[in-house]
Amino acid sequence: MAPASEAGPAQDPLFSGLILPRSRILDAEALTRSILAEIDAAGPLDPKSARAIAVRQMTEAKAAGNRALSETFEARPREARGLIRAQAALTDGLVTAALRVACERLHPLANPTEAERIAVLAVGGYGRAEMAPHSDVDLLFLTPWKITPWAEMVIESMLYMLWDLRLKVGHSSRTVKDCLRLGREDITIRTALLEHRFLAGHAPLAAELDETLWNDLFRGTGAEFIDAKLEERGQRHKRQGGQRYVLEPNVKEGKGGLRDLQTLYWIGKYLNRVPSPSGLVAAGLLTRDEFETFERAESFLWAVRCHLHYATGRATDQLTFDLQVEVAARMGYADTRGRRGVEVFMQDYFRHATRVGELTRVFLAQLEARHEKREPKIMGLFRRKKRLKPEYSLVNGRIDVLDPKAFLADKLNLLRIFEEALRTGFLIHPGAMRLIAANLHLIDEEMQHDREANRIFLDMLLRHGNPERALRRMNELGVLGAFIPEFERIVAMMQFNVYHHYTVDEHTIQCISTLAQIERHELDEELPIANRILTDGISRRVIYVALLLHDIGKGRPEDHSILGAQIARRVAPRFGLTAEECETVEWLVRYHLLMSDMAQKRDIGDPRTVRDFAKAVRSKKRLDLLTVLTVCDIRGVGPGTWNNWKAQLLRKLYRDTVTALDAGLESLNRENRADEAKRALRELLEEWDPKDLRAELARHYPPYWQALSNATHAVFARMLRGLGETEIRIDLDPDPDRDATRACFALADHPGIFSRLAGALALVGANVVDARTYTTKDGYATAVFWIQDSEGSPYEISRLPRLTSMIDKTLKGEVVAREALKDRDKLKKREAQFRFPTHIAFDNEGSDIYTIIEVDTRDRPGLLYDLTRTLAANNIYIASAVIATYGAQVVDSFYVKDMFGLKLHQKNRQETLEKKLRQAIVEGAERAKQ
């Protein structure tokens, strides 16, 4: 029985615009003839042998076709539409050849009965003729009635051949009635049937299924189908992280991904029986411009997905960090001065994902207008909002424009509608969004500098509660970038590191939202100082504008703080700020990282650090503004970035700086701090013999009393009491204020002690987040390390005894740290592509006593040990280490002296040490790659 061909794939209009002519992909007719001829020439064969001939020839044809497609796509890496159709055409050829071999040679019937008919249909994505290189092949074997033994043998033989071709086949054998029943019961099956496509076999049977589905299943059930698909979409988004700007998006299932576009097409097809997405225009669901946006996004996303499949050799849809670099290179994105190609690629990705969201909104609005889609239940929550201004109307609980012509006659309305939405609490109707997006050209230079327009924008930031929703919608529609052209450059800009969870524009909006939450007393417990500052009063105009502009200089070769300040100098006056306010905004943008850097990269227990910071901020007013900006900036990076550790550092720096500004810089002297610490220790150790207490207070040098808490001084006093010369005492204790475990060590002093301790901690898998070491006048050393587990959390109390034992063994020489660390120095594969140039700086001004060596490089296990071992080998004494981690990047700041107790002033000494530190970093990085 030869398959019917009058409606087969060769004539399907879906296959126009293939990336290669069909003959160069696979000539199905020629392949089938060749297989049949070889089987015939071999004489009588058992089914297995005949099948082997077919599989061998089909394997060769499949390999040749795939090779041709892969090479062509490599040369034309954006032509995804032609590729996915070509992949489907190649699969069609293999499936139809397998059917003919099964029907005509393996299980031939001279006079088939009516029951012995079979139609083979493609369903799902394959039915749409959209296949990535490693997509599944979903087949429906359709029979008139209950499956016959002959049909069962044909299907089994086909499947064996297709499996032997290494195709991932999903299949079902059903009658028309089965399809109808199962389609009613299961929305996933119904969706797959919606996209059925006849391949080969008995064409009338396939036509019967088509008519039955449309007449008896799809008709009259549109609202039910829409609700199910939108519910499915919501659940899918939730599984994928719930937002568009995730670090490693899923190109198929993620928000703004291919599945969202396919959902629009499914709904349009279900309601209007459109044969392809272009039919959505004729159906009135999308405009021509919107459909072009649909096509551009779809082509881009399919290109990404196909490159993912080729790069991994399997069906991969997640754009992990390592694959982002490879796909960007495959698609022709190159590094430029100031930006990596992968960052430009991901910016394009997020912009397309945003447009998919816009299309979804206007599409669903059209359905609501036709009453195809039920009004959202949530709209009932908005019934008691403020009354709208007369130029607006309420449609399905959302603000729409009453008269589009009158609305556009005053271009400032393109801003006013967002203020109205904030003022009333209503959402903006997608129809109004469509009107705005189509008229962005009205936002010209004149409007950008218009005093009233800027007043409206500033009021939006300041007057109506949290402006987050309005800013995000303005950004997605292109209004924000049009009104502030300098902002356009950072829209959807990705920063290729693990630290920043959001694109630059989304980070900015998150920062402003955090500020609004603090103002509304929603974060009082978490952010007491920021809350108090805002309650006492600062310039709201200055802080909101500074937050809006603080990262506006990103994405260029220059330092983004310096460039951002220059941009702020131009932009801030447009908002109507006074000269003094503009100067303050410029200063805040220029130094928006200063407080964070001081708190996280310097020893804030050193009075010199606080004095230098106080000199930089100069006034309590600027300190307050910078503190609030810093808190919002860190919290806006992403979930989990703000923690007790950072909060404590910033609070201490703020309080000490306030003291310095109020009482004078001289108030920050070591003697005062030492006296206070000793007085507190006397109270904590009041049960001690006075002679022992005097000895403890006298045995330490002044720096010991500066940076440690009173409780830690008490711990060390007890550890040092009666300590033998060969004894090592270890105390591990949770420090919830720092989100870490405090590890205290007391032992006899010797060179390289910091390195030994760092190695022992690295060996047990501890991440060091801060450390201090001190020597006593009688030859002992005290060291405190704050450590976290591999998840960035304090160790569970139950693990501390075993951890103590493991550290003790390492320190006693039972384990050699460097050798044992070899197998632990590996980078995670997904993070291996992050590149951070190493910067090493020597600072002799930041501390009165020590040279500060700042090492900014790629983080990895064992790095701190390698650096401290190198310093120890060069006779450098380490007093403390401040570790600041930013995702895969780390800044280790070491407070050091040479063997004579002096700073490292000599240039040649610095250069030699820098060379050796760089060598240690390079050698460690090589080990990590192996």
From Swiss-Prot:
This is Bifunctional uridylyltransferase/uridylyl-removing enzyme. PANTHER family: BIFUNCTIONAL URIDYLYLTRANSFERASE/URIDYLYL-REMOVING ENZYME (PTHR47320), BIFUNCTIONAL URIDYLYLTRANSFERASE_URIDYLYL-REMOVING ENZYME (PTHR47320:SF1). Residues 388-741 are annotated as: Uridylyl-removing. Residues 742-818, 852-927 form the ACT domain. Has four distinct domains: an N-terminal nucleotidyltransferase (NT) domain responsible for UTase activity, a central HD domain that encodes UR activity, and two C-terminal ACT domains that seem to have a role in glutamine sensing. Its EC number is 2.7.7.59, 3.1.4.-. HAMAP family: PII_uridylyl_transf. InterPro entries: ACT-like_dom_sf, ACT_dom, HD/PDEase_dom, HD_domain, NT_sf, PII_UdlTrfase/GS_AdlTrfase, UTase/UR. Disulfide bonds: none annotated. It holds the Pfam family ACT_ACR9_3rd. Gene3D superfamilies: 3.30.70.260, Beta Polymerase, domain 2, cca-adding enzyme, domain 2, Nucleotidyltransferases domain 2. GO terms for biological process: nitrogen fixation; regulation of nitrogen utilization. It comes from Cereibacter sphaeroides (strain ATCC 17023 / DSM 158 / JCM 6121 / CCUG 31486 / LMG 2827 / NBRC 12203 / NCIMB 8253 / ATH 2.4.1.) (Rhodobacter sphaeroides). Belongs to the GlnD family. Keywords: Hydrolase, Magnesium, Multifunctional enzyme, Nitrogen fixation, Nucleotidyltransferase, Repeat, Transferase. One of its GO terms (molecular function) is phosphoric diester hydrolase activity. Transmembrane segments: none annotated. It catalyses: [protein-PII]-L-tyrosine + UTP = [protein-PII]-uridylyl-L-tyrosine + diphosphate; [protein-PII]-uridylyl-L-tyrosine + H2O = [protein-PII]-L-tyrosine + UMP + H(+). Residues 1-387 are annotated as: Uridylyltransferase. Residues 504-626 form the HD domain. Modifies, by uridylylation and deuridylylation, the PII regulatory proteins (GlnB and homologs), in response to the nitrogen status of the cell that GlnD senses through the glutamine level. Under low glutamine levels, catalyzes the conversion of the PII proteins and UTP to PII-UMP and PPi, while under higher glutamine levels, GlnD hydrolyzes PII-UMP to PII and UMP (deuridylylation). Thus, controls uridylylation state and activity of the PII proteins, and plays an important role in the regulation of nitrogen fixation and metabolism. Uridylyltransferase (UTase) activity is inhibited by glutamine, while glutamine activates uridylyl-removing (UR) activity.
